[in-house]
Amino acid sequence: MHCTVNGQPRELPDEITVEGLIEILGLASAICAAEVDQKIVPKRERSETVLKEGQSIEIVTLVGGG
């Protein structure tokens, strides 16, 4: 299935969840935020939110520093 992830076109497996995408990207779920079609997906809903063809997904990680 074709989606846009962080502004880049990407081929994803069918029936993948937001949590599954975070795992594929190699990110730590605890320190990132997810948005699908400009709507924030709460952490508790990531494993239940199945992505669909053509959606736009943004995954943002937190970075410490100073």
Task: Describe each PLM feature range.
Residues 1-65:
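Ubiquitin-like/PB1-type beta-grasp interaction modules and other compact soluble beta-rich domains
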